Amino acid sequence: MAIKRYFALNDNTITNAYMSDLSTLATGSNMGAADILEVFSIYGQTISASATSSAELSRVLIKFDVTGSGFDSIKSERTAGRIPSSGSVNFYLRLFNAQHARTVPVDYTLDIAPVQHHWQEGSGLDMDTYKDLTKDRNGSNWMSASNSPDRAWTTPGGDYLATYNYSQDFSTGLEHLEVDITPLVEGWIAGTLANYGVGIKLSACHEAYYSSSVWGFSGVKYVDGILLNTTGAQKSY
């Protein structure tokens, strides 16, 4: 069985984690040029005066060249007969665990969903103190899909479709991600779905718990970049 690899065209990590002062959320930070991608949830690193535990999240955006005009886009390769027709081939999203010295979480689920609209990769590198901001620069962040033109996410952390959703369970935290997303890619190739890539995040029950007194207001989903999540986890992943 022949296997062909396609490498990501754009990718970025977006986060609302605290900066080093533990009071400023890094919602404007960009990591589009970093050499790794991070998905995490940190619960209760700080506690507010109202005894509310903090909820810090990180998500991944990633896009592949599916319908571009280049000779090596997936659609171009199919037209040229270098990959099989629909129904005779499968497309897998594969990301590899980057080894490091830190303890990894166990027993969690990652969700994959198509991004709803265009976003910019950006050129940020700093994944420790989040100093690379998108102010006056191109790039997506936790609050915005792009800076020029300025386009805010409808919901902080990205806007995603409710269709073509996938997930993978992780038991040890050391596994690689490998998910069959064939129907989604075929939709991109056929043009029935615009290709803005996918977002990767922890499932809602594994992202950090957060509640607020504003929760009762109709339509409220977040407060100052923190997502309200009353079914979330009260531990970190």
What is each stretch, according to the model?
Residues 1-237:
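Secreted, disulfide-rich extracellular signaling modules
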